[in-house]
C-alpha cells in the first residue's frame, strides 16, 4: 500500500483551513453571602430576572433580585458544601418543567423530577414555569359544566370548565376532601387532573396518592408535591409548575382540572423568600406584589376559543382561614381574583353537615351558564328555601307557635339539608343527583322520616336501576326534565316510596 506524501499534506492543509477557534464565554460571579437558602452574588452583569444559575455541587438557583452591584438568588437545592467565594455561572435559561403525556400517573416535585420511585420520566418537552396568561381574544366564556359529584355544589354553586372557584374555610373543615372528590368524579370523563400540594406533610400527600391509586384516579392524574420539608423556593414554584403541565394539555384541546392545596402556604413561602431577599414588607409582612403572585397564577386558568382547540383549565385554589375570618389579606385577595367561592364552616362541620358548605355565603359567578337545564330548573329556588329554613329554624328555637305553612317549610328545609349530606370519596353522578333533588324539591319525601332519608336515597337509586334502566341515560342525553322524564321520575319515586314505607312499618 503506497501512501503519497502529497495526499497527507493536502489533508493536513484542509484541516488547518477549516479550523475555527471557538472560545466559550460564560458570565460568572462570586458568592459574597450565603445562608437560609439565599445567596448574594457579585458579578453576573448580564443576568436575567428569573434566570437559572449554576452553583457548585450541581445545585441550581433562581435569580430574583437584580441589584446594582449584586444578584439576590434563591437556591433550588441544598446549600451544603457551597461557601462564600465559590464561582456561580449563568445558564442563559429560565426555570423549566417537563410536560407531556408521560407525566400522567406520576408524583413529581416542584421541578418536575419524579419522587415516586417509578424511574425517570422521558418527557416529550419542557416549558418555562412562569409565562404570560392567555389573552382575552383567545378565550371564550364558560359554557360546559364540570361536575364535582357533590350535590351541594353541583346544585347551588355550579362549576364550569375554565372557571376558577375558590374553596375557603378553617382548618379541618373538609376543603381537601371536596377537591379530592371532584378529582375522583372525573373518572371516565376525559378530564386530566393535577393536584398541587404546597407545604403539606409528606404523610398527607402519601395518603392522597394512595387514595387516588385505590380509586383508579392516578391513570388521569398528576401530583406535584412541595411538602413542608421542602425549601420555600420549591413551595413557591410548585403551583407554577403544575399550571405549566396543565397548559400543555389545554393547548392540545384537552380539559384539565387543577387543585392548589393550598395558596395560604404558598403566600407564606413567598413571604419567607421575599423577607430573606430583604424586599420591603407590607401588610402582614407580605411583600407588595403578593396579589400579583396569585393573580398571574390563577389567570392562567381559561377556556380557550374553538380556534385554539377549545381546551380548558379549571382551577380550584384552596385558602385556609383563621377562625372564619374571610376578611384577611390573602383570603380577600384570592376572593377578588376568582370567579366565586365555596365557603366551608366549622360549625356546620361539627354539627354533622358534611360537606360543610355554607350556601348563603358561597357563590359561583359564571358557573350558572354552564349548568345543565334539568339541574338549573330544580335548584332555582334551593338557595332561597335553605336561607328561609335557617331563618325559621333560628326563630322556632324560641318555642313560639308556628302556623301550618311555616311548619311545612321547616320540615322541607330539614329534608333539603339532610339530602345535601354526602360521605367522603362517594361522588354522585349528575343524573342521580337530579333524581333525589327532584324527589325532595317536589315534596315527594315529606312523609319519610328525616333520619331515613339517606336509606331512601340509596334504595331509590337501586330501584330505578332495576326497573327504569334507561331513565338515567335519558336525563344525561336530554339534559332537561321533559314531560316524559318527569312523569317517569314521579312514577318511580311513588312506587319505591310505597315499598319503602311498607318495609319501615
Swiss-Prot record:
The record's principal subcellular location, in a coarse class, is: membrane
Q: Which UniProt keywords apply?
A: ATP synthesis, ATP-binding, Cell membrane, CF(1), Hydrogen ion transport, Ion transport, Membrane, Nucleotide-binding, Translocase, Transport
The residues that hold ATP are 169-176
| Bilayer topology | Peripheral membrane protein
Q: What is its EC number?
A: 7.1.2.2
| GO molecular function annotations of the record | ADP binding; ATP binding; proton-transporting ATP synthase activity, rotational mechanism
Which residues does UniProt call coiled coil?
none
Q: Which reaction does it catalyse?
A: ATP + H2O + 4 H(+)(in) = ADP + phosphate + 5 H(+)(out)
Per the record, the domain of life is: Bacteria
Q: Name one Pfam family in it.
A: ATP-synt_ab_C
Q: InterPro entries, per this entry? A: ATP_synth_asu-like_sf (IPR023366), ATP_synth_asu_C (IPR000793), ATP_synth_asu_C_sf (IPR038376), ATP_synth_F1_a_nt-bd_dom (IPR033732), ATP_synth_F1_asu (IPR005294), ATPase_a/bsu_AS (IPR020003), ATPase_F1/V1/A1_a/bsu_N (IPR004100), ATPase_F1/V1/A1_a/bsu_N_sf (IPR036121)
| Location relative to the cell | Cell membrane
Any one Gene Ontology cellular component term annotated for this protein: proton-transporting ATP synthase complex
EC category = translocase
What cystine pairs are annotated? Answer: none
Q: Site (Required for activity): give the residues.
A: 362
Role this protein plays: Produces ATP from ADP in the presence of a proton gradient across the membrane. The alpha chain is a regulatory subunit.
The family note in this entry says: Belongs to the ATPase alpha/beta chains family.
The record ties this protein, via PANTHER family, to: ATP SYNTHASE SUBUNIT ALPHA, MITOCHONDRIAL
Enumerate the HAMAP family for this protein.
ATP_synth_alpha_bact
Q: How does it assemble?
A: F-type ATPases have 2 components, CF(1) - the catalytic core - and CF(0) - the membrane proton channel. CF(1) has five subunits: alpha(3), beta(3), gamma(1), delta(1), epsilon(1). CF(0) has three main subunits: a(1), b(2) and c(9-12). The alpha and beta chains form an alternating ring which encloses part of the gamma chain. CF(1) is attached to CF(0) by a central stalk formed by the gamma and epsilon chains, while a peripheral stalk is formed by the delta and b chains.
**What is this protein's name?**
ATP synthase subunit alpha
| Organism in which the protein naturally occurs | Clostridium acetobutylicum (strain ATCC 824 / DSM 792 / JCM 1419 / IAM 19013 / LMG 5710 / NBRC 13948 / NRRL B-527 / VKM B-1787 / 2291 / W)
Record gene name: atpA
Amino acid at each position: 500500500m503506497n501512501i503519497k506524501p502529497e495526499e497527507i499534506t493536502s489533508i493536513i492543509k484542509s484541516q488547518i483551513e477549516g479550523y475555527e477557534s471557538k472560545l466559550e464565554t460564560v458570565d460568572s460571579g462570586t458568592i459574597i453571602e450565603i445562608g437560609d437558602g439565599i445567596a448574594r452574588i457579585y458579578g453576573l452583569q448580564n443576568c436575567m430576572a428569573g434566570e437559572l444559575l449554576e452553583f457548585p455541587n450541581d445545585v441550581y438557583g433562581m435569580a430574583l433580585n437584580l441589584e446594582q452591584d449584586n444578584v439576590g438568588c434563591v437556591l433550588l437545592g441544598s446549600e451544603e458544601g457551597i461557601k462564600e467565594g465559590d464561582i456561580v455561572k449563568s445558564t442563559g435559561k429560565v426555570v423549566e418543567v417537563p410536560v407531556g403525556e408521560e407525566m400522567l400517573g406520576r408524583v413529581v416535585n416542584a421541578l418536575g423530577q419524579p419522587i415516586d420511585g417509578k424511574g425517570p420520566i422521558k418527557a416529550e418537552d419542557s416549558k418555562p414555569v412562569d409565562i404570560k396568561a392567555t389573552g382575552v381574544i383567545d378565550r371564550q366564556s364558560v359554557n360546559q359544566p364540570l361536575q364535582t359529584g357533590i350535590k351541594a355544589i353541583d346544585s347551588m354553586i355550579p362549576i364550569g370548565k375554565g372557571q376558577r372557584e375558590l374553596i375557603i374555610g378553617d382548618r379541618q373543615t373538609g376543603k381537601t376532601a371536596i377537591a379530592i372528590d371532584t378529582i375522583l368524579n372525573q373518572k371516565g370523563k376525559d378530564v386530566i387532573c393535577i393536584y398541587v400540594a404546597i407545604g403539606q406533610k409528606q404523610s398527607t400527600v402519601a395518603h392522597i396518592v394512595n387514595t387516588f391509586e385505590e380509586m383508579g384516579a392516578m391513570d388521569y392524574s398528576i401530583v406535584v408535591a412541595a411538602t413542608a420539608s421542602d425549601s420555600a423556593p420549591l413551595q413557591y414554584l410548585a403551583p407554577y409548575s403544575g399550571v405549566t403541565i396543565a397548559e400543555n394539555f389545554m393547548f392540545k384541546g384537552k380539559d384539565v382540572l387543577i387543585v392548589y392545596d393550598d395558596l395560604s402556604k404558598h403566600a407564606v413561602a413567598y413571604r419567607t423568600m421575599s423577607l430573606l431577599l430583604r424586599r420591603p414588607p407590607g401588610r402582614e409582612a407580605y411583600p407588595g406584589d403578593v396579589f400579583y403572585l396569585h393573580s398571574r397564577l390563577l389567570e392562567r386558568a381559561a377556556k380557550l376559543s374553538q380556534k385554539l382547540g377549545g381546551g380548558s383549565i379549571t382551577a380550584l385554589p384552596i385558602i385556609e382561614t383563621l377562625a372564619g375570618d374571610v376578611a384577611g389579606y390573602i383570603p380577600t385577595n384570592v376572593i377578588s381574583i376568582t370567579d366565586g367561592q365555596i365557603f366551608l364552616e366549622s360549625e356546620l362541620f361539627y354539627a354533622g353537615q358534611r360537606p360543610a358548605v355554607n350556601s348563603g355565603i358561597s357563590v359561583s359567578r359564571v358557573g350558572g351558564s354552564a349548568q345543565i337545564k334539568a339541574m338549573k330548573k330544580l335548584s332555582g329556588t334551593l338557595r332561597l328555601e335553605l336561607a328561609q329554613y335557617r331563618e325559621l329554624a333560628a326563630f322556632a328555637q324560641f318555642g313560639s307557635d308556628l302556623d301550618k305553612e311555616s311548619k311545612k317549610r321547616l320540615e322541607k328545609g330539614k329534608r333539603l339539608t339532610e339530602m345535601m349530606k354526602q360521605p367522603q370519596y362517594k361522588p354522585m353522578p349528575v343524573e342521580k343527583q337530579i333524581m333525589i333533588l327532584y324527589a325532595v324539591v317536589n315534596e315527594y319525601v315529606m312523609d319519610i322520616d328525616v333520619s331515613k332519608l339517606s336509606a331512601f336515597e340509596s334504595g331509590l337509586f337501586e330501584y330505578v336501576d332495576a326497573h327504569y334502566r334507561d331513565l338515567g341515560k335519558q336525563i344525561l342525553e336530554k339534559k332537561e326534565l321533559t314531560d316524559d322524564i318527569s312523569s317517569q321520575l314521579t312514577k318511580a319515586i311513588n312506587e319505591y316510596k310505597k315499598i319503602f314505607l311498607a318495609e319501615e312499618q
